[in-house]
Swiss-Prot record:
It catalyses: prostaglandin H2 = prostaglandin E2. Binds to telomerase. Binds to the progesterone receptor. This is Prostaglandin E synthase 3. Belongs to the p23/wos2 family. The keyword Lipid biosynthesis applies. Residues 110-146 are annotated as: Disordered. The gene is PTGES3. Molecular chaperone.
Amino acid sequence: VFIEFCVEDSKDVNVNFEKSKLTFSCLGGSDNFKHLNEIDLFNNIDPNESKHKRTDRSILCCLRKGESGQAWPRLTKERAKLNWLSVDFNNWKDWEDDSDEDMSNFDRFSEMMNNMGGDDDVDLPEVDGADDDSPDSDDEKMPDLE
């Protein structure tokens, strides 16, 4: 289970994994606003196998389920809709596809996050018409409005 706390410029990050609870706290932003979240999880996790990683824009947590292959219908024990919690469907994975590769993906995921900036050594392919001398359809005169 992946959880991302979107806090820019976080300091004093503390993530505590317990068997059925996750506690997160930090100071964030230029005003050092104190963030605190305590989540009673739907089911148990393995605190020793769960990890977190701080980036400039967020804190990424990877929770290892206590029993692999067991579906969680939601993240929290309570059924109430929490306004601060949303699903990232770009990273959605059906529980039926759950496998042991999940934690190894966390290492690759954090590596990907570290490499999201530009890389000056990357050779980009040539794009036809991308040079400054080529005529552009935006340069054509617009018809008068009637």
